[in-house]
């Protein structure tokens, strides 16, 4: 296999921010009178789109307007908690430089909403280097389906078989 492109997940892969997401979710759940997530629930929901998470948390289908309100509430908590606290994982700068030097294309594939993606990349100082981003709301099916990674490969103009994904 010749690697011509690399696709990275964002949260927990490029930036060590999963504890901040967990704290934001815990605060959200408490405010909404919901029981805390246990480890199995966190693992099952981790990496999924808000549109897939909230119906499961509330145990019912939710109209789009309500989904937006819930997602905005949770994600604004994350952005407030993470302000001034994000940096790339150790070794990422070196890895990106190596990929750039070898002409290997790079993209981000994330379930995060647009405002969080902009915030996280900017706070971590990665926005300039990682400008090709595919979000979960841009593909028919969220993770764990491969749609987001296939879309990233297509946007880079590279066959999926020539891509390496870090999730």
Model-derived segments and spans:
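Substrate-recognition "cap/lid" segment bordering the active-site pocket of phosphatases
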Residues: 85-87, 107, 113-166
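Active-site flanking residues adjacent to catalytic metal/cofactor-binding acidic residues
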Residues: 8, 166-167
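N-terminal helical cap/lid subdomain that shapes the substrate entry/recognition surface
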Residues: 2-10, 14-93, 98-102, 115
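Residue-level signal for functionally critical sites in structured catalytic/ligand-binding pockets
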Residues: 18-21, 53, 75, 120, ...
């Amino acid at each position: 296999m010749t690697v011509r492109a690399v696709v990275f997940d964002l949260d927990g892969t490029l930036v060590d921010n999963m504890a901040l997401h967990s704290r934001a979710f815990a605060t959200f759940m408490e405010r909404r009178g919901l029981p805390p997530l246990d480890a199995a629930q966190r693992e099952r929901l981790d990496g999924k789109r808000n549109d897939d998470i909230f119906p499961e948390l509330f145990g019912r289908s939710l109209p789009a307007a309500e989904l937006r309100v819930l997602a905005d509430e949770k994600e604004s908590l994350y952005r407030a908690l993470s302000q001034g606290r994000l940096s790339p994982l150790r070794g990422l700068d070196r890895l990106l430089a190596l990929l750039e030097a070898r002409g290997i294309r790079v993209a981000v594939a994330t379930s995060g909403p647009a405002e969080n993606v902009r915030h996280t990349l900017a706070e971590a100082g990665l926005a300039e280097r990682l400008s090709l981003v595919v979000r979960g709301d841009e593909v028919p099916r969220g993770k764990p389906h491969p749609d987001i990674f296939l879309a990233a490969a297509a946007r880079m103009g590279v066959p999926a078989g020539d891509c390496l994904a870090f999730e």
